[in-house]
């Protein structure tokens, strides 16, 4: 759960806040209740009292048109409705009755010189990331040819060795072992590394490797958007892999389907080359190029011509 104080501290560089009233409510929670980030903050709206209310010049002018009795009535309804905080944009100064009511109801009242529209945009982006659904996945997250690739598989299959080979070929490491994913938008999943494991890769027999120190600054990435999952499996006689799958394999991640390829681990197989090929093929599919579909059309055309 996010508090008002955390919001103020996290945005101190971009949004300088001045705390005016409601100092005792610094730990007041900003409840999302499954709402989108766009619904959590906006211009003054009495119909939606549970969101962060922003006063710009127009809102304050509208508020000031009412007499004290009506202002008190409307603000009481708003403050009782569970508003997390009231923000005054454009460097505006609040009327004394608004300060008194925020102190009375212990609701944070803050001001900032940032323009109202810009303030709302910045906070929506921040809240969208901060309150996004998250999960932690065991695997190695890489930047391969500009695509976010999650390498998964049971322990001992060589995920870290494969990552090391990809790094040596010029690709980048995002996270090893524990990858934190957040769904920051309806069709966008972003992955990053926990601070404790930043730049580290654990390889059996070698221990922990500081990839940034060994390979340089360009060998690591802060975050990437997940586009492909490469799942490693042991090659056994019992396994029967479909050589030409007609349907793309996907895996659900935070309620969103993500493309998935399965690679068998066997002696003599160059997995790094296979991963690169899988990424290139995924890029083609994202551009609307379906190699298998084109082959099947070509095959159907050949059969049709041979039957004449």
UniProtKB/Swiss-Prot annotation:
Amino acids binding ATP: 153-160
Signal peptide range in chain numbering: none
Annotated InterPro entries: HPr(Ser)_kin/Pase (IPR003755), Hpr_kin/Pase_C (IPR011104), Hpr_kin/Pase_Hpr_N (IPR011126), P-loop_NTPase (IPR027417), Ser_kin/Pase_Hpr-like_N_sf (IPR028979)
GO biological process: regulation of carbohydrate metabolic process
Region Important for the catalytic mechanism of both phosphorylation and dephosphorylation: start-end pairs: 201-210
Gene Ontology MF: a single term: phosphorelay sensor kinase activity
UniProt-annotated binding residues for Mg(2+): 160, 202
Active site: 138, 159, 177 (proton acceptor), 243
EC number from the UniProt entry: 2.7.11.-, 2.7.4.-
Pfam families cross-referenced by the UniProt entry: Hpr_kinase_C, Hpr_kinase_N
Catalytically driven reaction(s): [HPr protein]-L-serine + ATP = [HPr protein]-O-phospho-L-serine + ADP + H(+); [HPr protein]-O-phospho-L-serine + phosphate + H(+) = [HPr protein]-L-serine + diphosphate
Keyword line: ATP-binding, Kinase, Magnesium, Metal-binding, Multifunctional enzyme, Nucleotide-binding, Serine/threonine-protein kinase, Transferase
Domain of life: Bacteria
Entry annotated with the keyword Disulfide bond: no
Note: Both phosphorylation and phosphorolysis are carried out by the same active site and suggest a common mechanism for both reactions.
Assembly and oligomerization: Homohexamer.
Known role: Catalyzes the ATP- as well as the pyrophosphate-dependent phosphorylation of a specific serine residue in HPr, a phosphocarrier protein of the phosphoenolpyruvate-dependent sugar phosphotransferase system (PTS). HprK/P also catalyzes the pyrophosphate-producing, inorganic phosphate-dependent dephosphorylation (phosphorolysis) of seryl-phosphorylated HPr (P-Ser-HPr).
Entry's family note: Belongs to the HPrK/P family.
Protein name: HPr kinase/phosphorylase
Organism expressing this protein natively: Bordetella petrii (strain ATCC BAA-461 / DSM 12804 / CCUG 43448)
Lineage of producing organism: Bacteria, Pseudomonadati, Pseudomonadota, Betaproteobacteria, Burkholderiales
